Structures are given as C-alpha cells and as structure tokens.
Amino acid sequence: MSGNYYYPLDLSWSTEEISSVLHFLNKVELAYEKKVDAKQLLDSYKTYKTIVKSKAQEKQIDRDFQKVSGYSTYQVVKKAKAIEKGFFSLGN
C-alpha cells in the first residue's frame, strides 16, 4: 500500500531513536513493496529493540503501523528470522 500515512512514533524519543525506528519501518515497507535483505532487516530490528524494549509497546506499534499501512512488522521479522540471510518479499 503506497500512499501517505503516519508512522507510529513516540515523541519522547530522541532524533536518533526516531531515525532508527523509521529505518526499521522502511525495511518493513521494502519487504512488502519490493524485497529486503533478511540480515539487514534483522540488524535494523535489533537496533529498533534497543529503543522499543517492551513487548506491549512493540505490539502496539505493529498494530498501529498495520492499521495505517497494511504492513505487519511481526510477519516481516518472523520471515527474516526463518530465512536468516538472502532476500525475501511478502508483497503480492
């Protein structure tokens, strides 16, 4: 789903943290719109998890992002963990 939508960001995050979260969400978008390298996605997820530490917050961001974009961070990370390396796509 290409288009204009907002990213679920916490305004208490620093500029660097927001940049890291956006980097991860952009990788998720890439997994649906083209293809993404699993290792790069998992690296960005690792950084993302240093910012979004709680499972509850991670699930809320996934729900919010999926609601506005149609893309699931959970499904992308699950697929990346399953293949570990190489490119993959969840797009149609």
From Swiss-Prot:
What pairs make up the disulfide bonds? none
Q: Which residues cross the membrane?
A: none
Pfam families annotated for this entry? Answer: UPF0223
HAMAP family with a match to the protein in the record: UPF0223
Q: What NCBIfam families does the annotation carry?
A: PRK04387.1
Name this protein carries in UniProt:
UPF0223 protein SPy_1248/M5005_Spy0958
Q: Which domain of life is it from?
A: Bacteria
Q: Which family does it belong to?
A: Belongs to the UPF0223 family.
Sorted alphabetically, which InterPro entries does this protein's record hold? Answer: BH2638-like_sf, UPF0223
